[in-house]
Every structure is written in C-alpha cells, then in structure tokens.
Amino acid sequence: MADVTINADEVRSALNDFAASYDPGNVERVEVGRVSSAADGIAHVEGLPSVMANELLKFENGVLGLALNLDTRDIGVVVLGDFQGIEEGQEVHRTGEVLSVPVGEGYLGRVVDPLGEPLDDLGPIATDGRRELELQAPGVTMRKSVHEPLQTGIKAIDAMIPIGRGQRQLIIGDRQTGKTAIAVDAILNQRSNWESGDVEKQVRCIYVAVGQKASTIAAVRQTLEDNGALEYTTIVAAPASESAGLKYLAPYAGSAIGQHWMYGGKHVLIVFDDLSKQAEAYRAVSLLLRRPPGREAYPGDVFYLHSRLLERCAKLSDELGAGSMTGLPIIETKANDVSAFIPTNVISITDGQIFLQSDLFNANQRPAVDVGISVSRVGGAAQVKAMKKVSGTLKLDLASYRSMQAFAMFASDLDAASRQQLTRGERLMELLKQPQYTPYPVADQVVSIWAGTTGQLDDVDVANVADFERALLDQVRRTTNVMDSINSTGKLEDDAVAALKTAVAEVKRDFHGSKHGIEPGVEEHESLGATAVNQETIVKK
C-alpha cells in the first residue's frame, strides 16, 4: 500500500480556492428571538443581540412591539396591539426599522390610531411617505421668533393671553372646567382661514386624544364635522381602552404628522388632550419594565418625555419654508394644584399657560379663565395692533375689580371711584362670557373689548350686556366699514373710533324705552351696599 503524503501548502491552497469561489446566493442572516415572559402588555425577549433601541419587532402572530429596554440578558418590549395572542416561547423577528407613521394630505378629515391606521371605516389613506416618531426638534438656527397671531376666537384669550404661531400654550385646570372646549373652539376658529384658500392663512389642525372615553372622542369628531372643521383636522385617537404603550406613543404620532406639514412650509395647530394621561401611561410602562421609580412613581426621564415632544412645536426660519406648528397641550390638575409634578414640568417647558378655575366655571363665568395667573410669554409680539390697543387696560381693570369685590363684601359704604371699578368690572366679566363652540372673529372681538374698556357699557344693565353687544356688532356691520378696516390693516384708526362711538349712541337710543335696561349715570348713584355687588362672580380662595 502506497504511503499517503499530505502537503500542507496544497491543502491551504485548496481551501483558499474553495472559500474564494463560494457563492452564498440569496442566503441572508436572520436573528430570531423567543419570548421568555409576557404580561400586562410587556414582553421580555431573549436572543436578539443586535437589536436597536426603539426598533420595531414582529411577533409570531404578526403583532408589532417596540424595543424599549436593552438589558444584558433580554429585551423589554412594549406590545403595540392585541396582547392576548402572545405566549412564552413564540418567535420574535427584527424588522430593522424604527417606529414611524405614514404622513400626507390624505390624513385631513380622518381618525387614525397612533400607528397611522384608519379607525373611521372610510377606507385606506393616501400617504406621501413615512416619518419617524423620534426625531430631533428644530435647532436654534432653524427657528424664527413668534410674530404671527393664531386667533382662538375666544375674547378672554385673544385679548389678554394672546397666542402666536409656533408657540406652546398650556391649557391647565381641573376636570370638567372646559379645557377641551377651548381647544376645540381654537380649531373651529380656523375655518375662515381654511376657506380663504390662502396657504399663508390656512392652519391644518391635529387633535390628539390620549386616554379619553371613546364616546368623548366621537363627540369631538361630530362637533368638528357639524361645524365644517373636520376637513382640515386629523384626529389621532388612543382611547382609554388602548394599551399603555399606544397611549404613550399617540402624541408623538400626531407630532410627526404635523411636522411633515410644518417642514413643507404650512401652518399647523396641534392639541394634546391630555398629557397627564400620557405621563400616567409612560409611568405604567416604565414600572412594568422595572425601571427605577422617582417622584410620584414617575420614571426619572418623565421631564424629557414632554420636553422632546413640545420642543417640536416651532416657527421655522424663512430658509426652511417659514412653516409653524403651534402646540396646545392640556394638563388636568387635582383640586387646582398647579404645583404637582407633571403640571410644574409642563409649565416650565411651555411659553405660557391658560389656567381654568373650577370656582369660576361653577359661577357660570365661562370660559373660566383665571386671568390673574394665566400668562402668554411670547404671544404679545404676535397680537394684532388693534387688539393690543383696546385691551391694554383690560387685565388691570379686572385685577382692580377682583380686589375691590373682596373689599365690597364687608364694606357698607364705597366712594365713587370704588363704585366705578365695580361697575366697570361687572360688565367686563359679563362681556368675556362666551357660549361654547361660538368663536368670535378678531374684528368683532376688537369692537366688543373697545366698548368694555372705554366705559361704553357702564350704563348698561349687567343682565343686558350680551344683548347690547350683539346689537352693537350688528349696528357696526350694517352702518360702518370698521370691521373691514380692522381685518385689512390690523389697526383701529381714529376715524374708526369715532364711527364706533356713533354706533354706540344709536344702539343706546334704541335700547331706551325697550325692555332692555339702561342705567344712565351709574357713577352718580348713591353708595352701593354689599348686596348690590354681583355675588356669583366672587371667587375667594
């Protein structure tokens, strides 16, 4: 038998040739993990060593999950969908994609979930692409100062707490104080801008409902549809029945849809209703993922949860198209406690707050805006000049009225100046009352506020202020061009003021002898006792 001779060089050469000529074809590397445990909307997955933070994972039954915790031994995954079909031992596959939502004009008039899927049974949505949920907010050099007004149609807000395009204005108050009503009114007030067809005026609206009752969301949608506002509005719905993961993601989904329009040079108004429930959902997710709790059991990064969301609202520079996204986040307080953890966080992030008082609401002062602690830090620069001119003393007059009210409760005699403050204040408070879902055009607001702050209503009975206001606005529309002048120039000229005074005199003349009460010379009446003060508007904390 011949001896076998092995030449190492030949073996090495043969192996090298084989390796060089090997063609794997279409074989691809696939990582497969398995569910090690699953409970309460959270799944722990083992065996995916290369997974990215916030990557989408697909479970065996087709449900998607979001990788939030990347631990040494396993991955904490938030299930985005039906949790019931996920069991221990099921396979989990990587998708290689981070969470994103479809975007585009097709979303106007639709109701969608936080993943962008339609919920209104109106068929598929035509999209222009996708946008990631976790994107950096515009930088300092990408922004421009807020200088364009965004009218809400609410006299108390547009006069004293003005909002500009690109601003973040918090709406805060106890439950059932009219927070959602203010946000919906702001959406309804954009209808005339939308119908104008002018891209510079049009405002696309997004209403993000987090943790609300499904019936409440349906009622908001019906209100928008009945008032012709649904055609320029998108509703992102994560009702109370949804999982904590979807409620946590809903505001980011709405923001991504709005950012697509903002970077396209358009103007957007987005309402987050409400961020308290988003924070609670994020707390639930974090505790289930075994993240260490902090104050009120919220995780340590709960401030970042809201700051990275609200910082996406901006007024972009001219180089980026000059688009804007205005944010109206809503926060619910407990017993008017604005010093709680989440309220103080969001107050520090936003550019101002509109504080709604339950005592004012119960006293029939609606909208129940507490002008004493409500503020707009940047909106004043965007206020219409005519409104700024007529509302300059409004906040001061109301503050004097509030302080004098408390004094009048115990005083048996008041001097003429004090009686005048009470007279003016009562009528201003009545003037600021406004029915729900009836936003006022800015020109109407200017005329109404002018009548109140210049004392034109001082001799009108408090009970008839609303009727007098309607009659005055009708008279001004019919007999003058003041409204057109305000709309075109944004100013209230001297000749317009003279025309308004003439209109007031004519309306008062019509009121004489009718059922409406005119109280000529109120300031000359004898002293008013405590019983003469309108007690229902007194709020003493």
From Swiss-Prot:
Complexes and interactors: F-type ATPases have 2 components, CF(1) - the catalytic core - and CF(0) - the membrane proton channel. CF(1) has five subunits: alpha(3), beta(3), gamma(1), delta(1), epsilon(1). CF(0) has three main subunits: a(1), b(2) and c(9-12). The alpha and beta chains form an alternating ring which encloses part of the gamma chain. CF(1) is attached to CF(0) by a central stalk formed by the gamma and epsilon chains, while a peripheral stalk is formed by the delta and b chains.
Any idea of its EC number? 7.1.2.2
- The entry's ATP-binding residues are G173, D174, R175, Q176, T177, G178, K179, T180
* Localization per record: Cell membrane
Instruction: Using the UniProt annotation, give all residue ranges assigned to the region (Disordered).
Output: 517-541
Q: How does it sit in the membrane?
A: Peripheral membrane protein
Q: Catalytic activity, per the record?
A: ATP + H2O + 4 H(+)(in) = ADP + phosphate + 5 H(+)(out)
Q: Which residue positions hold the site described Required for activity?
A: S374
Keyword Membrane on entry: yes
Which protein family is it in?
Answer: Belongs to the ATPase alpha/beta chains family.
Q: What is this protein called?
A: ATP synthase subunit alpha
Q: State one molecular function term (GO).
A: proton-transporting ATP synthase activity, rotational mechanism
Q: Which UniProt keywords apply?
A: ATP synthesis, ATP-binding, Cell membrane, CF(1), Hydrogen ion transport, Ion transport, Membrane, Nucleotide-binding, Translocase, Transport
The top EC class, named as a word, is translocase
Key word Nucleotide-binding present: yes
